[in-house]
Each structure stands twice: as C-alpha cells, then as structure tokens.
C-alpha cells in the first residue's frame, strides 16, 4: 500500500499484472528495509462492518528487525504484546493472564508479518498493490484471519496502518512522534512474566 506507480511501471506500460505485483512488493520491502527500528505513539479506531465505531484506544508501538515487535495499549484498557524474536507474549493485566506462542505460529497468517520478516518465503504468501502513498497487502490464503492490511508512508516515515478482518471490522492506527530506538530502549522487546499470573503456553514445543 504505498507509492502510486513505480518508475519501472510507468516506463513499461505493457507489464503483466503478475510483474506489477512483484514490483510493488519489492518497493514496499525496500521501504521497510530502511526502517531498522521504529517507536511511535498510536491512536486506534475500530469500526464494524456498518462503519459504526466500536472502540477507541491509544498506546505505544515499536518494531526492530529482525522479528521484534512491541504493542502496548494503554487506554482505555491495558494490554501488551511483545515479540522477542522467538516467541510472542500477550499479557492481559486485568485478567492476570499471559499467553505465549511461537513467533511464526502467531504471525504467519497475518500481513503484519511483513513488518518484521524479510525472507522470500514469507513475502511470497501475500500480494501487494499500491495506491496513492499506501500499500495494500492481502494474504493469498483464504484461511488467514486478516482480510487485508494497508500501510501508509510520508516519504520514508510509516504513518498509518489499517487492518480489516474477515468479519468486516476495520482497525485504523495513526502513528505520531516516530523515532528510531536507541540501545537502552531495546529492553522493551524482552518480556518478563509478572508474579501471580496464569500462563497459557501455546508454543508447539511446549511441555504439557
């Protein structure tokens, strides 16, 4: 979801649709490659299939290559998602519960995977088209829980993400105060399990 048309597409109008998708995918990958680390505030709005607002929220979002992700919803209710490069930890303070799963298991079915994965195998699972400064990402598998993801840039800065699920709900995340992450802040990608919480270990190699 970014860039209207690449220079290659403009100069070669007889490109096949398959080649166009491949080119737009490479443009998006190049954009994301320039973002080695990112930390930003976000404002979230969720609407249902009838465009009725069903949720608002705000928090902190961060990512670092490779395979590190941080999502801290601070309002209206707190929740935390941390991908440390190997596992994904999901913490619900209100329920006093932590869920943990393998990174690939957690994000392989979501276009969000492209934010932290750069391997060809992962990228081959999605089609990418561009539209007026944004890139639309759709999984090729009909079993994916997310219908599509739109990511938008202002030059090299990631400014917006829009997720649509298979029920027609749309989550829009507007980013602000984007900065690179310094060495001291990388600790945010390490999750420490709080005392006195239930742990739901869904990792494939978990010992039951």
UniProtKB/Swiss-Prot annotation:
<dbReference type="GO" id="GO:0044874">
    <property type="term" value="P:lipoprotein localization to outer membrane"/>
</dbReference>
<comment type="similarity">
    <text>Belongs to the LolA family.</text>
</comment>
<dbReference type="GO" id="GO:0030288">
    <property type="term" value="C:outer membrane-bounded periplasmic space"/>
</dbReference>
<dbReference type="InterPro" id="IPR029046">
    <property type="entry name" value="LolA/LolB/LppX"/>
</dbReference>
<dbReference type="GO" id="GO:0042953">
    <property type="term" value="P:lipoprotein transport"/>
</dbReference>
<keyword id="KW-0813">Transport</keyword>
<keyword id="KW-0732">Signal</keyword>
<dbReference type="Pfam" id="PF03548">
    <property type="entry name" value="LolA"/>
</dbReference>
<keyword id="KW-0574">Periplasm</keyword>
<feature type="signal peptide">
    <location>
        <begin position="1"/>
        <end position="22"/>
    </location>
</feature>
<keyword id="KW-0143">Chaperone</keyword>
<comment type="function">
    <text>Participates in the translocation of lipoproteins from the inner membrane to the outer membrane. Only forms a complex with a lipoprotein if the residue after the N-terminal Cys is not an aspartate (The Asp acts as a targeting signal to indicate that the lipoprotein should stay in the inner membrane).</text>
</comment>
<protein>
    <recommendedName>
        <fullName>Outer-membrane lipoprotein carrier protein</fullName>
    </recommendedName>
</protein>
<keyword id="KW-0653">Protein transport</keyword>
<comment type="subunit">
    <text>Monomer.</text>
</comment>
<dbReference type="InterPro" id="IPR004564">
    <property type="entry name" value="OM_lipoprot_carrier_LolA-like"/>
</dbReference>
<dbReference type="InterPro" id="IPR018323">
    <property type="entry name" value="OM_lipoprot_carrier_LolA_Pbac"/>
</dbReference>
């Amino acid at each position: 979801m970014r860039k209207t048309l690449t220079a290659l597409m403009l100069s070669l109008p007889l490109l096949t649709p398959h080649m166009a998708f491949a080119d737009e995918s490479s443009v998006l990958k190049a954009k994301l490659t320039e973002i080695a680390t990112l930390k930003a505030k976000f404002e979230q709005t969720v609407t249902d299939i009838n465009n009725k607002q069903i949720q608002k929220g705000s928090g902190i979002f961060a990512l670092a290559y490779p395979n590190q992700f941080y999502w801290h919803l601070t309002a209206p209710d707190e929740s935390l998602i941390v991908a440390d490069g190997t596992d994904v930890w999901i913490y619900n303070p209100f329920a006093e519960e932590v869920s943990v799963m393998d990174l690939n298991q957690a994000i392989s079915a979501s276009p969000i995977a492209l934010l932290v994965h750069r391997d060809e195998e992962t990228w081959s699972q999605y089609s990418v088209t561009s539209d007026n400064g944004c890139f639309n990402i759709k999984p090729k598998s009909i079993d994916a829980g997310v219908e599509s993801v739109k990511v938008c840039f202002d030059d090299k800065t990631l400014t917006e993400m829009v997720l649509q699920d298979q029920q027609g709900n749309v989550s829009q995340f507007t980013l602000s105060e984007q900065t690179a992450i310094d060495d001291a802040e990388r600790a945010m990608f390490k999750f420490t399990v709080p005392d006195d919480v239930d742990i739901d270990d869904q990792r494939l190699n978990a010992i039951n």
